[in-house]
Design a protein with these regions (language model features):
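Structured beta-strand/loop patches that form or line metal/cofactor-binding pockets in enzymes
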Residues: 1-32, 36
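Metal- or metallocofactor-binding catalytic centers and their adjacent structured scaffolds
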Residues: 26-103
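Metal-dependent enolase-superfamily TIM-barrel catalytic cores that perform enediolate-based chemistry
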Residues: 116, 121-255
Length: 282
């Protein structure tokens, strides 16, 4: 079996692109992979386009060998969009391997480990606060709107929600420290924001009651000092987790040791060597 073609698809998801890759073979089997970045689809597409000549004619079923070859070809740009491009292609190769054997990808790796997976409402309110016109949902302009959203979460059967630092109002947004959010771009948590976050999570808690778990995603918005203060004020709500994106494992350990709020991280790390310092220090 040989790879005969590789195609990429940048899909309009309303306010962000999704990225897919399709790998075709000379035997008719097709594999699909997903490698979205959210902001740089053309960068991922470019990496795949650059790798394509070295992959055509190779056997996709030998996905470990293909991954090593791709890693060698991108070793000067190992992370970021290059890593995401490799991940999408790797998924497509594994998809082909599973189809070749007539089994699911899960079976290829030893079978499922659970019969069901708990679902939470992710980024609850975040999309509505910026894109209610696209979604066709009510805007979030007041704390009453946050209350209504919390009740909607419960009425739709979710047992948990995750939100961001929502800033309701006429020109509502979310953020708080950087990455295009309201406020400064220096990752400092201003004095007014801490009680604001307390009100936000308290409003959700009052709306959903004690049976629904709450999560807050801070993204990369705040430095250690701000995360310390936010984690402390959230202790009263017994959060399922506070999600902090951070490339400093020692700073994250400092936050973890300072609070009873559970900390979640890691979605922006690549490969074992980036995860290892977190495992070693936590």
């Amino acid at each position: 079996m040989k790879i005969s073609d590789i195609q990429t698809f940048i899909v309009d998801a309303g306010w962000r692109p999704w990225m897919f890759v399709k790998v075709e073979t000379d035997e008719g089997l097709v594999g699909w992979g997903e490698c979205s970045d959210g902001k740089s689809p053309h960068g991922i597409e470019g990496v795949i386009r650059d790798l394509k000549p070295s992959l055509i004619g190779k056997d996709p079923r030998a996905f470990e060998m293909r991954f090593i070859e791709m890693s060698i070809n991108t070793r000067q740009s190992r992370w970021g969009v290059a890593a995401k491009a490799l991940a999408g292609l790797d998924c497509a190769f594994i998809d082909i391997k599973a189809k070749y054997h007539g089994i699911s990808v899960a079976e290829l790796f030893g079978g499922p480990t659970r019969d069901k997976v708990r679902v939470y409402w992710s980024h609850c309110g975040s999309s509505r606060i910026r894109h209610s016109d696209i979604l066709g949902t009510p805007p979030i302009e007041t704390w009453a709107d946050v209350t209504a959203l919390g009740k909607e979460v419960k009425s739709r059967g979710f047992t948990a929600l995750k939100t961001n630092v929502l800033l309701p109002g006429e020109n509502a947004t979310f953020g708080g420290g950087s990455v295009g959010g309201s406020g400064t771009t220096d990752q400092i948590a201003p004095k007014w924001l801490i009680p604001h976050i307390e009100t936000l999570i308290g409003t959700f808690r009052d709306a959903v009651g004690d049976d629904i778990d709450l999560n807050l995603d801070l993204n990369f918005h705040f430095k250690t000092e701000g995360c310390l203060r936010i984690a402390k004020v959230l202790e009263q709500f017994d959060m399922l987790w506070l999600e902090i994106d951070m490339y400093e494992p020692y700073s994250l350990r400092q936050i973890k040791d300072s609070t009873s709020t559970r900390i979640c991280t890691g979605e922006n790390l690549f490969y074992m060597e980036q995860y290892l310092p977190y495992f070693q220090n936590h």
